[in-house]
Regions:
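P-loop (Walker A) phosphate-binding loop of NTP-binding proteins
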Residues: 11
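Hydrophobic positions on the alpha1 helix immediately C-terminal to the Walker A/P-loop
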Residues: 19, 23
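ATP-dependent small-molecule kinase phosphotransfer cores
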Residues: 30-88, 184-187
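Hydrophobic anchor at the beta1->P-loop junction of P-loop NTPases
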Residues: 8
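ATP-dependent NMP and nucleoside kinases share a basic, alpha-helical "lid"
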Residues: 80-119
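NTP-dependent small-molecule kinase module
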Residues: 137-195
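Conserved lysine of the Walker
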Residues: 16
Length: 195
């Protein structure tokens, strides 16, 4: 069996870490959380004070990820992070799972996690405007990118969908959600795009 490198990406608070950790456990895979790796290995080039977030040194991160993948004994590696497609060398990637969540539900999760002000609205806009999906498609194309609507689903339900794709029982699809159209039809677009 050849090694699979599986990226789990999406807007902050969409459920990446919960899904990626459980997926890695089910696959007996190596789990890599990019934010934790950046902090642990000091792969940080600065801090964005306004957004209260770290700025990752992408070149050093790419080098470290390459080392991890090439040195791994396990068949599967699950990598978790909203910028995973920017730092994991394309040649290693088997699948990119882009998790999507209805912005109305996502806003509640973000507020529960302490997001507010500009950080909240920028991340909601990112989800509405498909930023993580577009980034994944630009790097990997439709063949490797799987868009999953996780709205209202348990982690186990999402894992089941991913395992169906990995097992060849279900294909990858993009164009699954249209948050812009949904919010516009519900008269909520102006409330959510506040940048």
């Amino acid at each position: 069996m050849s090694r699979r490198v599986i990226l789990v990406t999406g807007t902050p608070c969409v459920g990446k870490t919960s899904v990626a950790r459980l997926l890695a456990s089910k696959l007996d895979a190596l789990y890599v959380n990019l934010t934790e790796l950046a902090v642990r290995e000091n792969l940080i080039s600065g801090k964005d004070e306004e957004r209260d977030s770290i700025i990752v040194d992408e070149n050093r991160m790419q080098h470290k990820i390459r080392e991890i993948i090439e040195g791994c004994d396990q068949n599967d590696i699950v990598i978790d992070g909203h910028y995973a497609v920017s730092v994991v060398p394309k040649k290693f990637v088997t699948y990119v799972f882009v998790l999507r969540r209805d912005p109305v539900e996502l806003r509640k999760f973000m507020e529960q996690c302490g997001f507010s002000g500009r950080k909240l609205w920028e991340n909601l806009a990112s989800e509405i405007l498909d930023v993580c999906l577009v980034d994944a498609l630009n790097v990997h194309g439709k063949e490797k990118v799987c868009e999953l609507d996780v709205t209202g689903k348990s982690v186990e339900e999402v894992i089941s969908e991913i395992l169906d794709v990995l097992g060849g029982h279900k294909g990858c699809h993009v164009g699954v959600v249209d948050w812009l159209g949904k919010l516009e039809s519900e008269g909520l677009l102006g409330e959510f795009l506040k940048i």
